[in-house]
Amino acid sequence: GARRLRVALLAERADASLGQHIERQLGAHWNARQVVLRSGSPLRLEGLERVDFARAGAILIPAADTMESSALDADTRTVKALMTMSAALEAAPPEEPPLVVAELQETRHGGILRALYPGPMEIVAGDEVISRLLAQIVRHPGLSHVYDEFLSDVSGSQIYVREGAQLA
């Protein structure tokens, strides 16, 4: 049968307040049995092993908060996390490396990530996404209101993605 989705979240400090924050953000979509919180650093193998990263279906690496660090620091942290994963996968290669979706602040660092990781990868470039959104807003007056509604942190203003087969 199909496996149920489980989310393992690795955070520097995973505690009850983090769980409560996630629960508030997800609202009715929250299911405590599907979310596992683990403390650790994605820059250290011990932390990655706590979430069994080598057997994951997908790994999401969000960029560090640029309010607390520079874009270069955020991208450096992403590169280091990927280097740690790559070294571990090289030492004990799984049948198929997990898909990695990594966020970068600067598009020019994408080549480094692709060279480091042996498996499938998608790169989300924060600067590029913002540039494209701004270009669309300039071309289509009024679109800023639509994006504001989609991207604001207000209940009911989220974008949910479904498999194509579910829409048929």
Q: Where is each model-derived feature located?
A:
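Cytosolic regulatory regions of ion transport systems
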Residues: 1-168
